[in-house]
Regions:
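Interaction-mediating elements
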Residues: 2-8, 18-319, 325-328, 340, ...
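Gram-negative/organellar outer-membrane beta-barrel architecture
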Residues: 169-172, 286-287, 306-539, 625-626, ...
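Membrane-embedded beta-strand positions of outer-membrane beta-barrel proteins
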Residues: 357, 389-393, 443-445, 538-542, ...
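A generic beta-sheet turn/junction motif
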Residues: 138-140, 153, 544, 587, ...
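C-terminal outer-membrane beta-barrel translocator/porin domains of Gram-negative envelope proteins
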Residues: 275-282, 362-366, 478-665, 675-699, ...
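Strand-connecting loop/turn motifs
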Residues: 127, 209, 227, 352, ...
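In a subset of proteins, long, contiguous C-terminal domains/tails are tracked
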Residues: 5-7, 522, 537, 564, ...
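Extended hydrophobic-aromatic, low-complexity segments
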Residues: 326-327, 355-357, 367-368, 384-388, ...
């Protein structure tokens, strides 16, 4: 026990030394600014309102103190101990200017300026009688700022009146009153008033008032009502310019599809233009079909100007993936009989054809390391309608650099060819979406040869035809009415064939598989809305295969009536899975991320289990990180050679349940940390006598594998390098009552570390 006290005393001494060392480097007469505190006094607000207001006001105070971690200031310490670098490179320069941060001095704190900022914010929130005071407290060479705010009563909105007359503009402004953000009974808030001006501006611009702006609106505040209330009057400023009061229509539409940035936007000459489908097009080489513009530009001559259509048109042209830059402008046509704007679109195309090579490095939690070389050729305008054709060839290898397995090397060689057409191609129907995102019809054809050296070769053919479209920035759909997979094994070695008798899972790997069906995927995410405190990601998939041939041939594996198509037993099943993620910000640089995965496959007719390539797996760097990839389940089943001396694990199932949660926080500079817990398993839908304990049952919760650990993430801006160290605390294959193994955790034991610690190295976050 005494030695632990010594360690504790040593840690305390080191912490104190680090804290004191930061102030000894300060210039003479200076003190270190360690932050500010603000107290909300008075009884006009309840406790929760005071807390929220305090957080808001504290965020306004400047400067920010040096960052603190576990009571220390590591960045300031790094800055100090680096001294003065002699050159603009090297370790000391990196430590001082990349990792470290200079001391925030008390002399740089402007109490009066911060007091006025707080006072102003309170008044903007309707606390018109607020009082704010500020002072400092010193402790040796450290200074803390203290602010005291007495908000007083918050003024509420009594009434909202839209002032109007007979003019077209003011009638249009008044017509927006039904959707006003200013509500009687709500607190006065300057930000809401600014939002109301922007709302009116957006609505007015959609009615042709191109030159109108939010600055042309005035909201007068009458605080003489009494009883801490105000009356608001919304009106158009009397000095609003004449052009801002006029509603404009669209005149001629000019398109320059081969525009160079070296040209000037003043080039509005009608020479060399051809009038087609309502557009004046300057395209002597006929690079693009006119239908590209008619599907992408939402204006037509004679339409009332609409800013929404302006934004949609630019976004649609950009989303084609054919143009590098898209710019547009509007010019008043003074010779027109009515107020008219001519529209100009300047399109700078990307190179029509491109060739791209990539070299990738991979490392997996099953000790496989490898590399991939790929070469892609792309044509961004294959048939003149902005169709994108991509032909990709690739080759890769994976070798085992550690572990107990023999490590049979894996080689892949394949090609994947896709044609993406920027519209829906539906037989007997023709329609177009009216949002900023381009709908696409996609065709894919691929072939791959996978060779597990000394074991077997798999020949895979893939083909699909379908659609991809977005409803909006949050929702995306992908539908493939036709999806084909054909896998044929060859060159199966005698060694592998002999091993199948001892490991039934190995037989699934080399089964001939033929899958023909349809797939649908729906994705919802609000992660692009970074200002939200919580974010959600949802993805659901449905996969249906073998129904039509199954109905025609009447296949039923239970009675032995299995059917063959093109020389292979085709798969028949329904499969669905969902991936739901929730992100909760717990601080400025910390969050809790959680995920749940539910997967269910129902094999029937011609199949007793899902085909191997469609089954669910758990374990690995993006799953349950305390277990090797594909090594968990199904259920409590465990292969007798549990250490997988001969071959790497490849356990799978028809049903999947997985939970993950991790606490993410910023440590310093580019280094982030995480603490995590993972749980899950897979099961078979039907009973398999060769895999006892693998079938799903009511005791599934008692069969979950659980692991925990911690990790570091190195955020290099262009990629995130992730390292996770995990270990199991629950092993489902053990007997009931002995599955929890948390009491066996012993980091000091070499054998425990060898059998349980799993190191994961990966790119990007696991979810």
């Amino acid at each position: 026990m005494l030695k632990y006290y010594k360690y504790y005393f040593l840690v305390c001494c080191l912490v104190s030394l680090a804290a004191c060392s930061n102030t000894r480097y300060l210039p003479k007469g200076e003190k270190l600014y360690i932050g500010a505190d603000i107290k909300i006094e008075g009884d006009s607000l309840i406790k929760n309102e005071k807390k929220a207001l305090r957080t808001e006001l504290k965020g306004l105070i400047r400067p920010k103190p040096n960052s603190v971690f576990l009571g220390l200031r590591p960045k300031l310490l790094a800055y100090n101990i680096a001294g003065t670098p002699k050159k603009a490179k090297g370790l000391r320069h990196w430590l001082k200017y990349k990792i470290g941060e200079p001391p925030v001095l008390a002399s740089n704190v402007g109490l009066q300026n911060n007091r006025l900022i707080i006072q102003n914010r309170l008044e903007n929130r309707g606390f018109f009688h607020a009082l704010v005071k500020g002072d400092t407290t010193s402790n040796k060479r450290k200074v803390k700022a203290n602010y005291r705010a007495v908000p007083g009563p918050q003024f509420l909105i009594n009434s909202v009146t839209f002032i109007t007359d007979s003019s077209l503009l003011e009638k249009a402004v008044t017509a927006t009153a039904a959707k006003t953000l200013l509500k009687p009974g709500e607190p006065f808030n300057l930000d809401v008033i600014k939002g109301e001006r922007d709302r009116i501006d957006q609505t007015i611009k959609d009615q042709g008032f191109y030159y109108f702006g939010p600055d042309n609106l005035l909201v007068k505040v009458d605080s003489t009502v009494g009883n801490h209330k105000v009356n608001l009057f919304v009106m158009v400023k009397p000095e609003t310019p004449r052009l801002a009061r006029i509603s404009f229509s669209i005149g001629d539409i000019y398109i320059f599809p081969n525009f160079s940035l070296a040209q000037t936007f003043a080039d509005t000459s009608k020479s060399n233009v051809v009038f087609t489908e309502g557009f004046y097009i300057n395209d002597k080489e006929n690079t693009f079909k006119p239908s590209v513009y008619s599907r992408s530009i939402f204006f037509r001559s004679g339409d009332v100007y609409n800013r929404k259509n302006q934004i949609l048109s630019v976004s649609r042209l950009t989303s084609l993936g054919t143009f590098k830059f898209v710019k547009n402008r509007f010019e008043r046509n003074e010779s027109a009989k009515k107020p008219t704007l001519d529209a100009f679109y300047y399109l700078t195309p990307l190179p029509r054809k491109s060739l791209r090579g990539e070299v990738l490095g991979t490392t997996k939690s099953n000790n496989l390391t490898g590399s991939e070389l790929s070469l892609s050729w792309k044509n961004r305008n294959t048939f003149g309608g902005a169709e994108q054709l991509q032909i990709r060839g690739y080759g890769s290898f994976e070798v085992q650099i550690s572990g107990t397995q023999h490590g049979y090397n894996t080689y892949r060689l394949g090609t994947e060819n896709t044609l993406s057409i920027p519209r829906f191609m539906v037989p007997f129907f023709g329609f177009n979406t009216s949002n900023a995102f381009v709908p696409r019809t996609k065709f894919m054809l691929g072939y791959e040869i996978l060779t597990k050296r000394g074991l077997y070769t798999l020949n895979s053919f893939r083909a699909s035809a379908g659609y991809n479209w977005k409803e909006n920035i949050r929702k995306e759909h992908e539908l493939n009415p036709i999806s084909i997979n054909f896998v044929k094994p060859t060159n199966v070695s005698q060694l592998y064939s002999d091993s199948v008798a001892n490991n039934i899972t190995l037989a699934k790997t080399i089964e001939k598989q033929f899958i023909i069906g349809s797939t649908y995927s729906f994705t919802y995410t609000d992660q692009l809305e970074a200002a939200r405190r919580n974010n959600i990601y949802f993805k659901g998939n449905i996969d249906i295969a073998g129904n039509i041939p199954g109905l025609i041939q009447g296949a039923n594996y239970k009675t032995g009536d299995t059917a063959i198509l093109f020389g292979a037993k085709y798969s028949q099943y329904i499969k669905a899975d969902v991936d739901l993620r929730y992100y909760l910000k717990t601080g400025r640089e910390s969050k809790i991320a959680s995920r749940i995965i539910l997967g269910f496959g129902y094999p029937y007719g011609n199949s007793s289990e899902l085909p191997f390539i469609k089954q669910f797996f758990t374990g690995g760097s993006n799953s349950i990180r305390a277990f090797r990839a594909r090594s968990v389940g199904p259920g409590t089943y465990r292969q007798e050679n549990a250490n997988f001396d001969n071959f790497l694990p490849d356990q799978s199932g028809d049903i999947k349940l997985e939970f993950n949660t991790e606490y993410r926080l910023k440590l310093f500079s580019i280094v982030n940390g995480a603490l995590f817990v993972d749980a899950g398993n897979t099961w078979l839908y039907n009973n398999n006598p060769s895999k006892p304990g693998a079938q799903f049952s009511k005791d599934f919760l008692n069969e979950l594998a659980v692991g925990t650990g911690f990790g570091l993430r190195f955020d290099l801006s262009f990629l995130v390098l992730r390292t996770d160290l995990a270990f199991p605390i629950r092993k489902p294959w053990l007997t009931v009552g002995n599955r929890w193994v948390i009491d066996q955790v012993d980091f000091s034991a070499a054998q425990w570390r060898r059998e349980n610690l799993v190191f994961n190295l990966a790119i990007g976050y696991p979810f």
